[in-house]
Regions:
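Phosphate/nucleotide-binding beta-alpha loop and adjacent structural elements of enzyme active sites
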Residues: 1-255
Length: 255
């Protein structure tokens, strides 16, 4: 599809102004999921549809104010929920929501932790309190920080025994690969993971190739979320290195 797009754009460039070529490039990219930002309800819908069964548990890593989790709970209110948010401001907001809904949702565990591939304290950088772009990796516009506890997921889950981890959402501003390495052997128990790829990976010097190779090693298929639904990425190609926020779903072929 991408090679067809490039041929079409090359032909168009001979007969139309550059701004039109740019428009068609963005349109083709968007239709194939590049830079496509669906609603949270749409993301959850696609994940549950691809999962094919009602999940017993859900993990969100990088919760912010909990909007994604709220959409999940609308669909599967009885599942066990594990939430990880390192920011004290955001943690307080989520905690308030849970306390308010505790009679309805008594199945939520909240952790004031960042998840990565190490167990230690680190700086969490942000531009303003409560920012959705807080990150363990400092970016040029982030001039503030707080010290947070960082843990590996396999360390946290030593005391939480799950036969299978059904549904995971990761949004950690470019730290996704570090976070995934912290799963250790738990990754083999995971059925589905939704994650983002975009310009935050530039700061980490990470590429889609790195994410692809990680999931491929553990027999996951990767799909990109598009306006037309999920499209399977059959093999890695360099044109996947598109540093505009896009959403992906990885699903384990083995369980």
């Amino acid at each position: 599809m991408f090679f067809v797009r490039n041929k079409i754009l090359k032909l168009i460039s001979f007969v139309v102004p550059k701004f039109c070529v740019d428009f068609f490039f963005k349109l083709f990219s968007l239709l194939n999921g590049r830079g496509y930002q669906p609603s949270l309800a749409t993301e959850v819908h696609y994940c549950l549809k691809k999962l094919g069964y009602v999940p017993k548990n859900f993990i969100e890593i990088g919760v912010h104010h909990g909007d994604y989790t709220k959409e999940v709970l609308k669909k599967i209110p009885a599942c066990a929920v594990y939430l990880f948010e390192p920011s004290l401001v955001n943690f307080a907001i989520i905690k308030k929501f849970i306390k308010r809904k505790i009679k309805k949702f008594n199945n939520i565990k909240l952790f004031n932790l960042a998840l990565s591939n190490v167990n230690k304290k680190q700086k969490l950088f942000y531009d303003k309190k409560g920012s959705s772009m807080s990150s363990l990796s400092k970016r040029s516009f982030q001039n503030k920080f707080e010290i947070v506890q960082v843990r590996r997921l396999d360390t946290v889950f030593k005391k939480i025994k799950l036969d299978r981890i059904d549904y995971v959402k990761i949004d950690v501003e470019g730290y996704e690969l570090n976070c995934l390495h912290g799963f250790g052997n738990l990754i083999k128990k995971v059925k589905l993971i939704q994650f983002e790829f975009g310009h935050t990976y530039v700061d980490q010097r990470k590429y889609f190739r790195d994410i692809y190779n990680y999931f491929n090693k553990f027999n996951f298929d990767i799909y990109i979320i598009t306006p037309k639904g999920l499209i399977l990425i059959k093999e890695y190609k360099e044109n996947l290195e598109y540093f505009i926020f896009s959403n992906f779903v990885a699903i384990n072929r083995n369980n």
